Amino acid sequence: MASHLSIRSLSGSSRYLARNKALKFTDLKSIKLREPIVPTHKNFDVSPDHPLWAFFPDGNKSETCFRETVDLDIQSRPWGLPELRRKSFEDLHKLWYLILKERNILAREVRLADSFNERSTHAHNDLDDKLTLTQKRIKQALIERQVAYERVQTFTDNQKEYLSDFEESYINADSSEIVSFNEKLVRLQYAFFGIQPQLEDYNLEEDINVKFVEGLSYVANLKLKRYLSQNPQSTEEFQTPLNGVVEELPFLLRDTEEAIEEVQELRNSGANVVLHKIEVFPFLRNALGKTIQEAYASDEQL
C-alpha cells in the first residue's frame, strides 16, 4: 500500500511541475506560414455517381446550376391522352419517372432563383405545368385500363352483346368518327382479348393464347365488314368470310386495304391454308416474331 501511495504522489508532482514550467518560443521570424486556402468547391471531391446529380439537367456534366429560358424546351407540348392510351404499362411507368425527374430539376432551379430574387422563373413554371398535365393524363390512361379490365371481369356474360353493339356502331360510324372508334377498338381488343397496342410489347409465349385468337378473328372481320360497307363494289371482288388466322393476321398488322391485297395474293398463290388447332399458336408466334424483328431492323436503319 505504501509503494502505491508514493507512485501516486510522484505522478501528481510531475503534472504540477509540468504546468508551472515556463514556456519557451523559438525564433518566430524563422517560422514560415503557408498561404491561406481560399474556400472553393474545387477543394472537395464529389463522386460522379452521387444521387444528388440527378437534380441537375446534365448530371455530373452540368456546367451551371440554373438554366435560363433559352435553355428550356419551352416549345414542347404535353402528351395527348390518345397518344398515352397506345403506350404499354412499362412505357407509361418510364415516362412518369422521367417527368418526375425533370420536375425535381425545375423545382430546385425555381427554389434557387427565389433565394436570390434576381432571376425570372416564368418559363420554368410554365414547363412544370405542361409536365404536370402529362402526369394527370398518364393517371387517366391507367385508370381507364383498370376500369375496363374490372368491367370485363364483372360482366363476362354480357361480352357478346357488348361486342355486337360495338361492331354495329363501328361499321356504321361516319368518317369523322372513325378515328375515335379506332382508339376505342385498341382499348377494347386489349381489355377483352389481351391484344397489345404495340408489337414490341408482346410476350409471344404468354400472350398468344385462345383469347388472342378469338380477338384476332373479331378485329379482322370487324375491319373487313366496315371496309366492304364503305366500298360496296369490292364485295364481288373479295370473297368472305376470312379463312382462319392466316388470312386474319394481316388485318391486325396492316391497314385494311393493304391487308385485303395481301389476302388476295395469298389466295391467288394458294398459300391461304387452314391450319389445324395445334398449328395455330406456333404460326402466330413465328409470324409476329418475324414482324417484330423486321420492325427493329427498320428502326436501326433509320
Swiss-Prot record:
- Tell me which InterPro entries the record gives: MRP-L47_sf (IPR038340), Ribosomal_uL29_mit (IPR010729)
Q: Which GO terms describe its molecular function?
A: structural constituent of ribosome
> What main location does UniProt list?
mitochondrion
Gene Ontology cellular-component terms for this entry are: mitochondrial large ribosomal subunit
Q: Name one GO biological process term.
A: mitochondrial translation
User: A Pfam family for this UniProt protein?
Assistant: MRP-L47
Q: Where in the cell is it found?
A: Mitochondrion
Q: Which UniProt keywords apply?
A: Mitochondrion, Ribonucleoprotein, Ribosomal protein, Transit peptide
Q: Which PANTHER family match?
A: LARGE RIBOSOMAL SUBUNIT PROTEIN UL29M, RIBOSOMAL PROTEIN L47, MITOCHONDRIAL-RELATED
Q: Report quaternary structure and partners.
A: Component of the mitochondrial large ribosomal subunit. Mature mitochondrial ribosomes consist of a small (37S) and a large (54S) subunit. The 37S subunit contains at least 33 different proteins and 1 molecule of RNA (15S). The 54S subunit contains at least 45 different proteins and 1 molecule of RNA (21S).
Family label: Belongs to the universal ribosomal protein uL29 family.
UniProt protein name: Large ribosomal subunit protein uL29m
Recorded source organism is Debaryomyces hansenii (strain ATCC 36239 / CBS 767 / BCRC 21394 / JCM 1990 / NBRC 0083 / IGC 2968) (Yeast)
